[in-house]
Design a protein with these regions (language model features):
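Nuclease catalytic cores that cleave nucleic-acid phosphodiester bonds
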Residues: 82-211
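Domain-level signal for Mg2+-assisted phosphodiester chemistry and nucleotide/NA-binding surfaces
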Residues: 2-102, 155
Length: 211
C-alpha cells in the first residue's frame, strides 16, 4: 500500500522559499556587468552616463523580492571608466578594462574586498554583481566563514536547469549563491538612465525652520 506521508498543505509549505532574512548588506558591483544586465535584450544606458543616486534603493527593492529584508551599508562600484559622480555610501574602485587584461584587475580587486569583508565580519550579507565564474573559489571561501553571498541575475535564473545547458559557467556561478536576486532589465535601465546630476539632490529648506 502506498503511503502519503505528507499532506497537500505540508507539500506546498515544503516548496516555499526560505524564510525572510534580515541584517546588513554590502554590495560589490561590477559596473561593466550591470550595464550588460541593463542592456539585456534591449537598448540600455551608456557606461559614461550612469545615474547611481538611486542604485541603493533599487538594490534594496530587489533584495526584498528575494526574501531579504536587509539594509545596504555601502556599495563598492568597480568601474573601468573615470567616474564623475560622488554618491554618499558608494566607494568607486578603478579597475583596468576587461579588453586589456581579461578581467584580472577586477578579479583581484573585488576578490580581495570580498575576502576582507568575510574575515572582518563587517556585514551579514554581500550582494555580488558579476558573471565571472572565476569568483567561485572566493565566494565559497567567504561562505565558509558564515557570510551569505547573493548574486544579481536576469530572468534566466528563474530556470536554472535550462541555464546550466545554455550557459554552464553562468549557471555554476549562480548555483553557488545563497539567493539569486533577479532584476528586470527594463527597470534597471530606467534607473541607470535617470537624471545623473553631478551633485547630490538639493533639500528644500523649510521656511518655518528658517524663522
Amino acid at each position: 500500500m502506498k503511503r502519503d506521508y505528507f499532506s497537500h498543505a505540508s507539500k506546498d509549505a515544503y516548496r516555499q522559499p526560505l524564510d525572510q532574512q534580515s541584517g546588513s548588506c554590502i554590495a560589490l558591483i561590477d559596473a561593466r556587468f550591470l550595464v550588460w544586465l541593463a542592456q539585456h535584450n534591449q537598448a540600455g544606458p551608456k557606461k559614461d552616463a550612469l545615474n547611481r543616486f538611486d542604485l541603493a534603493q533599487f538594490l534594496i527593492g530587489a533584495l526584498g523580492h528575494a526574501g531579504l529584508d536587509v539594509s545596504i551599508k555601502r556599495i563598492y562600484w568597480y568601474a573601468e571608466e573615470n567616474e564623475v559622480l560622488d554618491v554618499d555610501g558608494q566607494i568607486v574602485r578603478k579597475v583596468l578594462s576587461h579588453d586589456s587584461d581579461g578581467g584580472i584587475s577586477l578579479l583581484k580587486t573585488l576578490g580581495q574586498d570580498l575576502s576582507r569583508l568575510a574575515q572582518s565580519k563587517a556585514c551579514d550579507h554581500v550582494l555580488l554583481a558579476t558573471d565571472d565564474e572565476r569568483f567561485l573559489t572566493a565566494i565559497d571561501d567567504a561562505q565558509l566563514t558564515g557570510l551569505q553571498i547573493h548574486i544579481l541575475a536576469d530572468d534566466a535564473a528563474s530556470n536554472m536547469q535550462q541555464l546550466h545547458q545554455s550557459d554552464p559557467g553562468w549557471g555554476r556561478l549562480l548555483s553557488q549563491a545563497d539567493r539569486r536576486v533577479v532584476v528586470q532589465a527594463k527597470s534597471l535601465a530606467e534607473m541607470l538612465q535617470g537624471s545623473a546630476s553631478k551633485e547630490a539632490p538639493q533639500v528644500q529648506e523649510d521656511p518655518e525652520v528658517i524663522r
